[in-house]
C-alpha cells in the first residue's frame, strides 16, 4: 500500500471519527491539515527512496555494460594470442554482464515510471494542502455566517412557522392532486363518449350499406 493510500484511509478515519463526535468543522479541517502535512513528509521520503533505487539500478546497468565491454576486449586479445578457450570464457562472461545490464536497465525503466507517478501524486498532495489552507479562512467565515443564521432562525420563530408552512404546502399538494385526478377522469369520459360516437357512426354505415344492397336486390327482381 502506497503512502497516498495510507493517507486517504487515515484522513477518512480521523474525519469520520470527529464528525461522529459532532466536532467543530474548523477543528476537522485543522486535523485534516495536520494529517496531510505529516503524510506529505512521509511521501517525500518515499519518493526520495524510489529515486535512489532508480539511480542504483542505472548505476548497476552501467557497471555491467562496462564489464561486458571489457570482457569482449579480453576475448579479442585472447583470440589474437591463440587461446580460443580463454576467448570463449571471456565472451561467456561478457554475455552474462550484458544480460545483467539489460535486466537492470529494464528494472530502472519500471522504477523511473514509479518515481514519475509518485512525483505527480506528491505535487497533487502539495496543491491540495495549499488549497485547504486557502479555504480554511473562508470556511471559518461561512461557519460564522451559518451560525448567525441559525440564531436568527431560533429567535424569530421561523423554525416553528416552518412546520405550519410545511403542513400547508402538503395540503396544497394534496388538493392539487385531487384536481388533477378529476380533470383526468373528465378527459377520460370525453374520450369514451367520442369512441362511442365513432362506433355508432360505424353501425349507421353498416345499416346504410345493407339498405342499399336490399334496394338493389328488389329493383333487380322487379325488372
Swiss-Prot record:
Keyword Coiled coil: yes
Keywords annotated in UniProt: Coiled coil
InterPro entries: PspA_VIPP1
Entry coiled-coil feature ranges: 29-185
Cysteine pairings via disulfide bonds: none
Family statement: Belongs to the PspA/Vipp/IM30 family.
Protein name: Phage shock protein A homolog
Amino acid at each position: 500500500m502506497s503512502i497516498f493510500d495510507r493517507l486517504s484511509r487515515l484522513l477518512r478515519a480521523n474525519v469520520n471519527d470527529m464528525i461522529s463526535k459532532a466536532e467543530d468543522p474548523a477543528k476537522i479541517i485543522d486535523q485534516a491539515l495536520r494529517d496531510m502535512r505529516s503524510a506529505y513528509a512521509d511521501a517525500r521520503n518515499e519518493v526520495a527512496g524510489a529515486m535512489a533505487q532508480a539511480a542504483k539500478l542505472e548505476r548497476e546497468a552501467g557497471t555491467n555494460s562496462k564489464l561486458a565491454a571489457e570482457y569482449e576486449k579480453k576475448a579479442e586479445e585472447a583470440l589474437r594470442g591463440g587461446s580460443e578457450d580463454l576467448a570463449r570464457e571471456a565472451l561467456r562472461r561478457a554475455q552474462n554482464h550484458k544480460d545483467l545490464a539489460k535486466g537492470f536497465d529494464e528494472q530502472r525503466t519500471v522504477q523511473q515510471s514509479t518515481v514519475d507517478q509518485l512525483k505527480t501524486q506528491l505535487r497533487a498532495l502539495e496543491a491540495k494542502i495549499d488549497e485547504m489552507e486557502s479555504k480554511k479562512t473562508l470556511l471559518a467565515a461561512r461557519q460564522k455566517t451559518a451560525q448567525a443564521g441559525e440564531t436568527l432562525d431560533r429567535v424569530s420563530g421561523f423554525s416553528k412557522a416552518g412546520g405550519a408552512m410545511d403542513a400547508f404546502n402538503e395540503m396544497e399538494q394534496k388538493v392539487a392532486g385531487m384536481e388533477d385526478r378529476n380533470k383526468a377522469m373528465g378527459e377520460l369520459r370525453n374520450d369514451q363518449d367520442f369512441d362511442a360516437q365513432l362506433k355508432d357512426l360505424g353501425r349507421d354505415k353498416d345499416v346504410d350499406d345493407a339498405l342499399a344492397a336490399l334496394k338493389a336486390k328488389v329493383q333487380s327482381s322487379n325488372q
